Amino acid sequence: MAFKVVVSDSKTGKSYQFETESNALIGKKIGDEISGSIVELEGYKLKITGGSDRCGFAMRHDIHGAMKMRVLLKEGPGYNVKEKGLRRRKSLRGNTISKDITLINTKVVEYGSAPLGGEPESTE
């Protein structure tokens, strides 16, 4: 199963996309820290912040498991509130990565020795 892993760098404000065939991500949850070596980033430590499945349904941290559910929302990830007090039932994925997930969002927690984007760092 191929995963697209988006790595966000909070220092530069840029994000980088990698692909991996690793099954080491299956079973991990939102908030777990993983090694950057899974996406060829030696020395980096990444934190899983979200993702989406093959149909485009977003993952949500407070839905436990890997299944898709229709939940009633009033705010938070997966729902943009248009009016105050408005609630809506939305289809969302759970917080666990399974074979149905295609996109995984991560952020850098610990930096490695090599630059993230592949371009050399300036010495200015």
UniProtKB/Swiss-Prot annotation:
Q: Which InterPro entries match?
A: Ribosomal_eS6, Ribosomal_eS6_arc
Its family?
Belongs to the eukaryotic ribosomal protein eS6 family.
In which organism is this protein found?
Methanococcus maripaludis (strain DSM 14266 / JCM 13030 / NBRC 101832 / S2 / LL)
Q: Name one Pfam family in it.
A: Ribosomal_S6e
Q: Which GO terms describe its cellular component?
A: ribonucleoprotein complex; ribosome
The signal peptide annotation in the UniProt record is: none
| GO BP field | translation
What molecular function terms (GO) are annotated for this protein? structural constituent of ribosome
Q: Which domain of life is it from?
A: Archaea
Protein name in the entry: Small ribosomal subunit protein eS6
Q: What are the alphabetically sorted keywords of the record?
A: Ribonucleoprotein, Ribosomal protein
The record's section on SMART domains has: Ribosomal_S6e (SM01405)
